[in-house]
C-alpha cells in the first residue's frame, strides 16, 4: 500500500498542538514573545514532546507557547490555513480541527472574532486544495462549567457555518462527567454534535458516562475501555467511534509502545476506530506516518484501511452530501 497516496480522514487534531515550527518562530518575533533562542531546533524543543515526558500533564505543557502566539485574528487564520495545507499534502480529504476559543482572548479578541478567524483560514485552504474542514469547539475541564455555557452561546451562531461540534478536553480525572450533564444537554439542543475526551488516562468508566450522560457520539481516545467491560460493550453496541491517536498515547504513557496499543484489537472486534494525530507538532507526527506505524506493527491490509476510512467518514460531523463524495475517494 502506498499510504501517502491513499485518502485520509482526520477527526482528532488540535490546532494549537499543530503549529509549524517556522511559523512559531516568525510569530514569536512578530509578537515580541521573548525566547531564550529563536533557532529552529531550540524552538522545536518548546513545541515537541520531550523524551522524558511522563504523563498527560507533562504533554499539555507543550501548549504554552502556541497559546501565547495565537492571540490575534491573523495568526489564528494563518495557522488554521497552514494546518489544512499540511494535511492536504498527505491526502487528508476531510479534517475536523479542534481548539478552545476561550484561550485566545488575552489581547482583546471576542470569541466571535476568534472563531471567525479560524473558519476563515479553513475556507481559504479549501479554495486552494482538495480538502474540506470543519471546527470542533473544545472546552477545558479545568475551567468553570460557566465557561462551557459561554462557548455554547457564541458557538451556536456558527453551527452549519464551519462549527460542527463541542468537546471537553484537558487533564482527565476519574468521574469528571456528571457535572457537565446539563450543559451538554443544552449543547445538543443548540445543534452541536458531541465528542468527548475520555478513557485517555486509565478510566474506562468515563467513556461509559460520556456516552450515557453527555450524549457523546464519538470519544477522543477511549484507550482504556478494555478495563471497563460495560464501557467496551456500550461503545461496540452503539457504534460509537473512537478517535485513536497511538503516538500521542505513547507520548503520554497511556501505553509504552505501538505493540501495546489496543487499536487493532478494537478494530478486529468491530469497534469503530478512526486514526488521527492528536497534535501533529507536539507528537512530531503526521497522519501518513501514524498509518505507517500502525501498518508496520499490525500488518493491516487494504481492507482494514478501507474499513477504517469508511467508518471515519460515517463518524464525521460533515454533511451527508460531503460524506457521499468522501466515500467515492476510496472506492477502487
Swiss-Prot record:
Binding site for Zn(2+): 12, 14, 197, 278
Record-linked SUPFAM superfamilies: Metallo-dependent hydrolases
Top EC class, one word: hydrolase
Catalytic activity: adenosine + H2O + H(+) = inosine + NH4(+); 2'-deoxyadenosine + H2O + H(+) = 2'-deoxyinosine + NH4(+)
Cross-referenced InterPro entries: A_deaminase, A_deaminase_dom, Ado/ade_deaminase, Metal_Hydrolase
Cofactor annotation: Zn(2+)
GO biological process, one term: inosine biosynthetic process
Any one GO molecular-function label of the UniProt entry: adenosine deaminase activity
Keyword line: Hydrolase, Metal-binding, Nucleotide metabolism, Zinc
Manner of cofactor binding, per the entry note: Binds 1 zinc ion per subunit.
Keyword Cell inner membrane assigned: no
Site location (Important for catalytic activity): 221
Gene Ontology CC annotations of this record: cytosol
Keyword rRNA-binding among record annotations: no
Residues forming the catalytic site: 200
EC number: 3.5.4.4
Alphabetical list of Gene3D superfamilies matching this protein: Metal-dependent hydrolases (3.20.20.140)
Binding site for substrate: 14, 16, 170
Family as reported in the entry's similarity comment: Belongs to the metallo-dependent hydrolases superfamily. Adenosine and AMP deaminases family. Adenosine deaminase subfamily.
Function, as annotated: Catalyzes the hydrolytic deamination of adenosine and 2-deoxyadenosine.
UniProt cross-references to PANTHER family, sorted A to Z: ADENOSINE DEAMINASE
Protein name listed in UniProt: Adenosine deaminase
Organism of this sequence: Clostridium perfringens (strain 13 / Type A)
Gene: add
Amino acid at each position: 500500500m502506498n499510504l501517502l497516496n491513499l485518502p485520509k480522514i482526520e477527526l482528532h487534531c488540535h490546532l494549537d498542538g499543530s503549529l509549524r515550527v517556522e511559523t512559531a518562530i516568525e510569530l514569536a518575533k512578530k509578537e515580541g514573545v521573548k525566547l531564550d533562542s529563536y533557532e529552529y531546533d531550540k524552538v522545536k524543543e518548546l513545541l515537541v514532546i520531550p523524551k522524558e515526558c511522563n504523563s498527560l500533564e507533562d504533554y499539555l505543557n507543550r501548549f504554552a507557547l502556541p497559546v501565547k502566539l495565537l492571540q490575534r485574528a491573523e495568526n489564528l487564520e494563518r495557522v488554521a490555513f497552514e494546518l489544512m495545507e499540511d494535511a492536504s499534502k498527505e491526502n487528508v480529504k476531510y479534517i475536523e480541527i479542534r481548539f478552545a476559543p476561550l484561550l485566545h482572548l488575552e489581547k482583546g479578541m471576542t470569541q466571535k472574532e476568534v472563531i471567525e478567524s479560524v473558519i476563515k483560514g479553513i475556507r481559504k485552504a479549501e479554495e486552494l486544495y482538495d480538502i474540506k474542514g470543519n471546527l470542533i469547539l473544545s472546552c477545558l475541564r479545568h475551567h468553570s462549567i460557566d465557561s462551557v455555557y459561554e462557548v455554547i452561546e457564541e458557538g451556536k451562531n456558527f453551527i452549519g457555518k464551519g462549527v460542527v461540534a463541542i468537546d471537553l478536553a484537558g487533564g482527565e480525572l476519574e468521574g469528571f462527567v456528571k457535572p457537565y450533564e446539563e450543559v451538554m444537554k443544552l449543547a445538543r439542543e443548540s445543534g452541536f454534535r458531541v465528542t468527548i475526551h475520555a478513557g485517555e488516562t486509565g478510566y474506562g468508566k468515563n467513556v461509559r458516562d460520556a456516552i450515557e450522560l453527555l450524549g457523546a457520539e464519538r470519544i477522543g481516545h477511549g484507550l482504556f475501555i478494555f478495563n471497563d467491560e460495560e464501557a467496551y460493550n456500550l461503545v461496540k453496541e452503539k457504534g460509537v467511534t473512537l478517535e485513536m491517536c497511538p503516538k500521542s498515547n505513547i507520548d503520554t504513557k497511556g501505553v509504552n509502545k505501538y505493540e501495546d496499543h489496543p487499536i487493532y484489537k478494537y478494530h478486529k472486534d468491530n469497534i469503530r476506530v478512526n486514526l488521527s494525530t492528536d497534535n501533529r507538532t507536539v507528537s512530531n507526527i503526521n497522519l501518513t506516518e501514524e498509518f505507517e506505524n500502525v501498518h508496520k506493527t499490525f500488518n493491516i491490509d487494504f481492507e482494514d484501511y478501507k474499513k477504517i476510512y469508511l467508518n471515519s467518514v460515517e463518524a464525521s460531523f460533515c454533511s451527508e452530501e460531503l460524506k457521499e463524495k468522501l466515500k467515492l475517494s476510496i472506492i477502487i
